[in-house]
Each structure stands twice: as structure tokens, then as C-alpha cells.
A protein has these predicted regions:
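Intrinsically disordered, low-complexity boundary segments flanking structured domains
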Residues: 13-19, 138, 176, 212-216
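Metal-dependent polysaccharide deacetylase catalytic core of the NodB/CE4 family, i.e.
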Residues: 25-37, 47, 88-92, 100-200, ...
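A generic local structural motif
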Residues: 16, 78-82, 134-137
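C-terminal domain-boundary segment and adjacent tail
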Residues: 49-86, 179-181, 196, 205, ...
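N-terminal structural segment of carbohydrate-active enzymes
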Residues: 2-12, 20-71
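Short boundary motifs at domain starts and secondary-structure transition points
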Residues: 17-22, 82-87
Length: 216
């Protein structure tokens, strides 16, 4: 996992070297939250730490193009494992957490400009309920444009702290809602705040092929 502050000096050669030496998928996953240009002097220091400017994303994708780095999705990894697709020599996954409105307004145009693939992990209970998040129509547009939409639960709760019934709703209801909206299977899940326990792992394995966390 590569965090915002690490992107300034991003050099994932170690991942690719390991990938070439082993018969396994070892590739960097770049995690983004807000795609917005926010000054370092802002009072919202958490927002600043979790933000990445659109122009920096543009330059990062320029760098990828110059160095033949290919953004993939988890859907691509499934195709690679099944032998329907070839793994590029240099590959990364771009993942965007939460389904913020700026993913649609700021990240989407930059990704489309570079023909770059990405995965958007959506909090299923937010579209059309919170103006800070992308709408259902916008999520559908992202899916129609070829981006992968994954689940980030229904409410972004700490799943490890929930009772069994609520936990199942967060894991499976989020998948069902998103699939109903986009008309495609949801293959990937992102643990809210990276938190999970054995119960969470078991349920996610039942409903998804891939899961992403910030915790090893």
C-alpha cells in the first residue's frame, strides 16, 4: 500500500523485482481519498493529509506513461489468474476510497484523459444522501466508463466492533446495492479504516474475490 505522502518519491521497483522473481502478483496499490487542491496551512489538517491535488494526479499518470506503468483493476487480476489476460511487466492499482464527489469531478477527468484504469470503493449508503459524495448517477457513469466499483461497506463503520446481523448487512447489503445500481458484479471490498477481525474476513471471503486494507 502506498500512502499520499509517499507518492512524492514513488518508486515501486522493489515490487516489480519481487514479482519477476516469484510466480505471484506483487504490485503496488496506490490509495487515494480526496482529490482536491488544499493548502498546507488549512485548519483541516486531516483533510490536507488525505488529499492529493488533481494536477499531481495528472503528473503521476504522465510518469506512468513515460515509464510504461500500467494501471490495472481487481477485475483485471481475475482475468489474469484465469488466463484471459496477460500481466504487464510494470503494473499498479489505483484505488479511491469512499466515493467522494471530488472523485467524480476531479479524478474522473484526469483518469479519462490518460485512459487510466482505477477502482472506486463506494460507501453504499452515501450516494444521494450526502452532498459530499458522488451521486448514484455519477457512480453509474464511472462504471459505464469502465472503472471498477468496489464496496466500502454501507456506512463506513468499524466492522470489527459490530454484532453479527449488522456486520452481515454492511458486507452483503453494500454489495447488493452497488450491483443493483451499476448492473455489474462487485468483486472487491475495502475494509473501512483498514479494520477487520476473523469474523469480518470470513464474511468478506464469502462475498468477494478481492479485499483491500491499510493493515498488513
Amino acid at each position: 500500500m502506498v500512502w499520499r505522502e509517499q507518492l512524492e518519491n514513488f518508486s515501486p521497483e522493489e515490487h516489480w523485482t519481487q514479482q519477476e522473481e516469484q510466480q505471484s502478483f506483487t504490485l503496488p496499490v496506490l490509495m487515494f481519498h480526496y482529490i482536491q487542491d488544499i493548502p498546507a496551512t488549512t485548519k483541516d489538517q486531516r483533510g490536507y493529509r488525505l488529499s492529493y491535488a488533481p494536477q499531481k494526479l495528472d503528473k503521476l499518470l504522465d510518469f506512468f506513461e513515460e515509464h510504461a506503468i500500467t494501471p490495472l483493476t481487481f477485475r483485471d487480476l481475475k482475468a489474469i489468474v484465469e488466463g484471459r489476460q496477460t500481466l504487464p511487466k510494470r503494473a499498479v492499482i489505483l484505488s479511491f476510497d469512499d466515493g467522494h464527489l471530488d472523485h467524480y469531478t476531479n479524478a474522473f477527468p484526469v483518469l479519462r484523459k490518460h485512459h487510466a484504469k482505477a477502482v472506486f470503493f463506494v460507501i453504499a449508503g452515501k450516494p444521494d444522501q450526502d452532498p459530499k459524495f458522488a451521486t448514484r448517477d455519477q457512480i453509474r457513469e464511472l462504471a459505464s466508463a469502465g472503472f471498477e466499483i468496489g464496496s466500502h461497506s454501507v456506512s463506513h463503520s468499524n466492522l470489527a466492533s459490530l454484532g453479527s446481523k449488522r456486520l452481515r448487512e454492511e458486507v452483503f447489503e453494500s454489495k447488493a446495492r452497488i450491483e443493483k445500481e451499476i448492473g455489474l458484479p462487485v468483486l472487491s471490498f475495502c475494509y473501512p479504516a483498514g479494520r477487520y477481525d476473523a469474523r469480518v474476513l470470513k464474511l468478506v471471503k464469502e462475498g468477494y474475490l478481492f479485499a483491500r486494507t491499510t493493515q498488513p
